Design a protein with these regions (language model features):
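Short, glycine/acidic-enriched loop or turn micro-motifs at the edges of active sites
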Residues: 26-27, 92
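Metal-dependent polysaccharide deacetylase catalytic core of the NodB/CE4 family, i.e.
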Residues: 15-18, 38-134, 168-169
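Alpha-helical segments flanking ligand/cofactor-binding loops in enzyme cores
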Residues: 35, 77, 141-142
Length: 214
């Protein structure tokens, strides 16, 4: 099932639905993740920064994160042929908050068109680059909606249970050190309180004129 379908049924489903999302379209997904997910028929969405196809994760330059190879256009087509949904992760992987109207349109719309031309189908979902509360704003969300996307995901922590907020979809981040027990607790909602803490911290910092560096 597509992410859009899961969002649409989340309010009335008899049991929780889960999909897996991958930001950045790292090349190593093809070797380490997609074959396993395909074997178990597990749905997943891969969010592609179209301006970096066949390059490295240059946005991590100067950070503690190593530069990672990004899928090529052929890799993206291969992933789609395996049954995985493809979404846009903008063109340049830059923060959308505060961009000019022209640049914002390029980041949101040009990436959508490039993927649609590549795959021959509509691209229905978008992932905000970096995805935090200070990384995009209402203007960006409006452009995403007007471009024809049906949903947009953030890095706001938590389970998503409100289909009316389809342009601010929450996600549960899984870290490399998480155990199976911790993963189950996250899915069951034991860490939902972190979402309220995240909102409170953002509101305090906004009220005091500070921004959270990401």
């Amino acid at each position: 099932m597509s992410l859009d379908g899961i969002i649409g049924q989340c309010e009335h489903a008899d049991r929780p639905a889960v999909t897996i999302t991958f930001d950045d379209a790292f090349e190593n997904l093809l070797e380490h993740a997609l074959p396993v997910l395909s074997e178990h028929q597990a749905p997943a969405v891969i969010y592609v920064p179209t301006g970096h196809l066949g390059k490295n994760s240059e946005w991590d330059h100067g950070s503690a994160h190593p530069l990672m190879p990004i899928m090529t256009a052929a890799d993206v087509k291969n992933a789609r042929s395996m049954g995985f949904e493809i979404g846009s992760h903008s063109r340049s992987h830059i923060r959308l908050r505060g961009l000019s109207a022209v640049t914002l349109q390029q980041e949101v719309c040009d990436s959508k068109k490039m993927l649609e031309d590549l795959l021959g189908e509509q691209i229905r979902t978008f992932a905000y680059p970096h995805g935090g509360r200070n990384d995009f704003d209402g203007r960006a969300a409006d452009v995403v909606k007007e471009a024809g996307y049906r949903s947009a995901v953030t890095t706001f922590f938590g389970r998503h249970n409100d289909p009316s907020h389809r342009y601010e979809v929450r996600r549960i981040i899984i870290w490399p050190g998480d155990t199976t027990h911790e993963l189950q607790r996250k899915i069951d909602g034991h860490y939902d309180w972190l979402a309220f803490k995240e909102i409170a911290v953002h509101n305090v910092r906004t009220a005091t004129g500070r921004t959270l560096a990401r």
